[in-house]
């Protein structure tokens, strides 16, 4: 454990991703760190379960100097994208970056921290508009699910929440996250479809009998 536990500011979408948030809070608490959750409203909602939660901090009222690190949690796309351009949030990211404090973002929240990603590798949810924003900021998008580059920790999607949160705790504690991921080279695009014998037989039967269901 670090000699001094970190106090982490967690910015969440108003309609937040519950898997990302609760997994992150569990990791921070288990490692002895404290946190403050901030959002654009004091009532936030799990976008999947509809569970409402009351918090005490509006994101507009937060200051970098009061925290040791910053994390950004995604959720509803409209709410998540709002932080990409919200002046106070972008100013916060810049302040944390200038102060050399650890920063983490996951899924569609990664473009929110692009000001801290110049010259750094990042994982991100593969939307073209996300990639364009990141590249314009000088970030280096990666085709792997989780990336740690210095004190910046990013993840592609919620499936990596636990590893992402634990890796960030390692960074907070001055430890090597020890994440080794491999790019298998897959890229979405057009490719020749190979015929499937079973499907071709089914199509032939359907065409011959005029039936759409085969027993």
PLM regions: where:
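Catalytic nucleophile serine of serine hydrolases
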Residues: 107
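Extended, subdomain-level signal for the structured scaffold at the beginning of enzyme domains
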Residues: 1-103, 111-123, 128-215
